[in-house]
Amino acid sequence: MTDQTSLQYTAEHEWVLIDGDVATVGITSYAADKLGDVVFVELPAVGDELAGGSVVGEIESTKSVGELFAPIDGTVTEVNDDVVASPDLVNSDPFGAGWLVKVRFEALPTLLSHDEYVALVGE
């Protein structure tokens, strides 16, 4: 499991782990809890160009369907096929095995710190 205090966050409940010019993206445990049991995940394809803030996939649960937003501009370099095959990883390990995509970026937008995200969700 990733140290959540070292991550950056979006107001759309996604976390971002920066490693050089690649960002690993997932949804937070707050979002996973609100969704309930995740049963389907649709992700962008490797090579897709993402525009920050745009809808790039969806996460379907027994309660609802949520949109997956691109937190940054960039190119998808890797998708987590394990999450597509076993969507429950989003619930069981959202900050680890439940990561969604890796994106190569040129410029990083302003994201929320851990403390700012905790204040946003009130947890």
Swiss-Prot record:
Cofactor(s) required for function per UniProt: (R)-lipoate
Q: How does the record describe its quaternary structure?
A: The glycine cleavage system is composed of four proteins: P, T, L and H.
Q: Which residues form the Lipoyl-binding domain?
A: 22-104
Q: Which domain of life is it from?
A: Bacteria
**Function as written in the Swiss-Prot or TrEMBL entry:** The glycine cleavage system catalyzes the degradation of glycine. The H protein shuttles the methylamine group of glycine from the P protein to the T protein.
Concerning InterPro entries, the annotation shows:
2-oxoA_DH_lipoyl-BS, Biotin_lipoyl, GCV_H, GCV_H/Fam206, GCV_H_sub, Single_hybrid_motif
- Keyword vocabulary terms for this entry: Lipoyl
- The organism is Clavibacter sepedonicus (Clavibacter michiganensis subsp. sepedonicus)
Q: How is the cofactor bound?
A: Binds 1 lipoyl cofactor covalently.
Q: Which GO terms describe its biological process?
A: glycine decarboxylation via glycine cleavage system
* N6-lipoyllysine: residues carrying this PTM: 63
Q: Which residues form a coiled coil?
A: none
**What CDD domains does the record tag this protein with?**
GCS_H (cd06848)
The answer to whether the entry has keyword Signal is no
GO CC annotation terms, alphabetical: cytosol; glycine cleavage complex
The UniProt entry, under PANTHER family, shows:
GLYCINE CLEAVAGE SYSTEM H PROTEIN, GLYCINE CLEAVAGE SYSTEM H PROTEIN-RELATED
> One Pfam family this chain carries?
GCV_H
Q: Which family would the database say this protein is a member of? A: Belongs to the GcvH family.
- Name of the protein in question: Glycine cleavage system H protein
